[in-house]
């Protein structure tokens, strides 16, 4: 029966993988719902306050770029050629061979440069033209040939074109998507969890599918009780920090994190899913690798290490078991549990795996940095070629002996190694850090310039264009059987109690890596959700032509901000009523649907604006004269933050104004006033609304 369950788990997992690759959006079991377009009023202020409404910030985001491009291509004739030129350059930069770049560069030059020059309408500098012409005459076509044009295209787009985008519906859509992104609160219900694919000291790793996009991931779940039992809180939190540091920027050679979240019992990392097994497993199955095959793995690992080191992260646990293969055979560095940030302070702890640890790591109290990883790389490459670490002769398991040999033994390289390979390994395995390859001031560049890699084009390595020496078998789960992986003994943690102080440690644990979420959405449901939302909004616009739009009331007035919130609706404070609010310098107005009367609360009636919590949801509490309270709830975190800020600012400024004006005797009045207003259907420019 157990065997049957294992087979069914494998089949279910493989089917999910195949469907996710083909049509991930079709596998989505939840729908992303974009907020109302009126969210723009709040989100624009929220983003502006954080310096996010700039050309550079929006153009560099995946969804921002897609919406900006769409606006230019469909609605702005003068910007269309610039965006098309930009896209052709980006395609050129990704070409694999010099021959392809030569053909493509000529086409780009003829279409976007020469044609414009002949028409005397080329809006670019003479230096940019000369730069490209000079290279093409010599048949030199580096990937960055058109970089001067990229800079000038962006310069031309960031002025009036960008301002028109900000005023358009496409920016409204950007605000809608950013609101969704900034309000992500993941739980286990947001994933379909499949079979277990691995286990570590604190928890397990599962294959899973994200419900709203259909994308497959690996879910690494750490048990909070087990962490507490082993006093591993610092390690768990450190892994989350290290993953957040390396998971930005384009690096296909590290198992990166897209999300982190936690439940009362577990810490969860949502990571890139790697289906091809690890190099330790393949070394045991395949046998040792040739120099050519090892070169392939070494090159991709070097680029992974370079990405980490550029972010001042030293990995500290480089070994074949931590190098995972994807379904095509390309590799990624996994498990950053021992990684360390050395930007402010160099580490000196002796951590890692014996047989791969650098001498300076083994010497207690000695500080080190990325130097440790280059020594470990030398050890690992030796193992791929010979089947054992250079310091683990005759399969000894004595850790002290392995460490002693690492500190004292001169590594003897076999005569069968090529001179180029010997040079590389001798450089990496130098005990003296000041003489070690990769530690002489230029980092990874020194290693990449080794004669052993002379035949490689590093741009081709980065683009993963070299054929992998080993392709994992398709239609198989390249992981141990679920029953072989086993499970933890629950008795171990039976006596462990999680206190409020334990949970407080993980208060800031949840995280969404913005660029990875945007990439996931762009690859899966972006077009579908946009099309559906466009249809919905078009229907609402037709319907609202008779009633008018909520936003219309704010036009031509000194309205600071407007949007939907929910307020407590009766004296017993038990029911929420959704209303549309308008914040003015001296008052807060709101209304219901259709022709419901407009209500008003003046700033002079407010005594304070505070944040409170009702049923675990953050709310705004407005204390009003006479001991009354006014409670407001927002649909998202950014809205709550911005409404709180703007209400407090308006209240503070109103208070300062009152203090400057001589006091007048007023009759007591009701704090909330109901306005008899013209129904929205009758509003127009004639009455200034």
Curated annotation (Swiss-Prot):
Class of the enzyme per the UniProt entry, highest EC level: transferase
Known EC number: 2.7.11.15
Single GO BP term: cardiac muscle contraction
Annotated tissue distribution: Ubiquitous; brain, spleen > heart, lung > kidney.
InterPro entries named in the record: AGC-kinase_C (IPR000961), GPCR_kinase (IPR000239), Kinase-like_dom_sf (IPR011009), PH-like_dom_sf (IPR011993), PH_domain (IPR001849), Prot_kinase_dom (IPR000719), Protein_kinase_ATP_BS (IPR017441), RGS (IPR016137)
Record: active site: 317 (proton acceptor)
Ranges for domain PH: 558-652
Keywords recorded for this protein, A-Z: ATP-binding, Cell membrane, Cell projection, Cytoplasm, Kinase, Membrane, Nucleotide-binding, Phosphoprotein, Serine/threonine-protein kinase, Synapse, Transferase
Protein name: Beta-adrenergic receptor kinase 1
Organism, as annotated: Bos taurus (Bovine)
Gene: GRK2
